[in-house]
Regions:
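Structural signature of Gram-negative outer-membrane beta-barrels, strongest in the C-terminal barrel
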Residues: 37-47, 53-267
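Short, solvent-exposed beta-strand-terminating loops
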Residues: 2-10, 82, 104, 267-270
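Solvent-exposed loop segments that connect transmembrane elements
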Residues: 2-32, 162-179, 216-231, 274-286
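Outer membrane beta-barrel strand-and-loop segments of large Gram-negative receptors
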Residues: 233, 237, 257-298
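Intrinsic disorder/low-complexity detector
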Residues: 10-15, 51, 191, 247, ...
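Polar low-complexity intrinsically disordered regions
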Residues: 1-2, 57, 139, 273-275
Length: 298
């Protein structure tokens, strides 16, 4: 199979109005900004799967194999503009306390040398690009052994990120940083049939959570759910998860299932939130690797 996908995100004019407490307990305008953002991503992929059934008397194992390749490119560009005004401006009195900023403040009559003016907050550090190459192959075998059924296999993955970031704020100064990993992810699934309606399952598998482009880049973007700015961390490492699962399953009738499961997950280098304080009070969230974590339950 062969696939192609394209995704984009275009924010042509996002306006952010920030207010703060001023005299007489009224909320006054603190800052007005406009942001123009464009993200484009292209993904090309190809994959192939193979299956071979064998028969050795009553023993009927199955061999499975496959390969997968993916190439992804991304570009992200953003520009931010701020409205400014001088302390001795000739704007209408009390404009900072206007309820409808768009209608009462951002009007043609309020633009001028001694009124409102618009300037760009140049920051090339917020732009980035990159590409990702992933090559994978897997091999697995299914072994029916009477009441037991064993499926075991492994997946090999080669993954390479190339992130292109600017090193200077006021000019285009792209620098490429490469991140590469070669990993093997084993898995095994053991099923034991107690009878026609009940069975036990035990499984183990290893997986990975790789950092995304925006989690690695130095780009700063505003997250409305957090109510704060977010910045990436180019020192992030992939997080690896070892998954264990033990399950009892009962099928009392067709279409019905009752199961009880215990799971345990061990995380190495999990990616977590962190934050720093900028400008005395503003929070900037980012990402970091914790040393490890465990998660288990029933």
């Amino acid at each position: 199979s062969v696939g192609y996908a394209y995704a984009n995100r275009n924010l042509p004019d996002r306006r952010l109005i920030e207010r703060t407490d001023r005299m007489e307990q009224r909320m006054g305008i603190y800052r007005i900004s406009r942001e123009f953002t464009r993200l484009d991503e292209h993904i090309v992929s190809a994959g192939s799967n193979y299956r071979k059934d064998f028969r050795f008397g009553t023993f009927e194992p199955t061999l499975k194999a496959g390969a997968y390749g993916e190439y992804r490119t991304r570009t992200y560009r953003t520009r931010q503009f701020q409205y400014g005004w001088q302390p001795d401006n000739t704007l209408p009195q009390g404009f900072l306390f206007a309820d409808d900023v768009q209608e009462d403040v951002l009007t043609d009559a309020n633009y001028g040398p001694d009124k409102l003016y618009l300037y760009e907050e140049v920051n090339f550090l917020n732009n980035y690009g990159g590409d990702q190459t992933q090559l994978a192959g897997y091999l697995g075998i299914n072994l029916p052994l009477g009441a037991f059924n064993i499926y075991a296999g492994a997946r090999y993955e080669y993954n390479r990120h190339v992130l292109k970031m600017n090193t200077r704020q006021f000019e285009e100064s792209l620098q490429s940083t490469a991140y590469g990993n070669n990993d093997i992810f084993p898995s095994v699934n053991l099923t034991y049939k107690l009878n026609d309606k009940q069975q036990l399952r035990a499984a183990y598998g290893r997986s990975v959570n790789r950092p995304e482009f925006r989690e690695l880049s130095t780009s700063v973007y505003y997250d409305f759910e957090l109510g704060s700015s977010v910045m990436g961390n180019y020192d992030l490492k992939p997080a690896y998860i070892d998954n264990f699962d033990l399950r009892y399953e009962w099928y009392p009738s067709a279409g019905e299932q009752i199961s009880v499961a215990f799971f345990y997950k061990h995380f190495k280098n999990p990616i977590e939130w962190t934050y720093t304080v900028a400008g005395g009070t503003d929070l900037i969230y980012s990402f970091m690797n914790a040393r490890g974590a465990n998660n288990y339950g029933i």
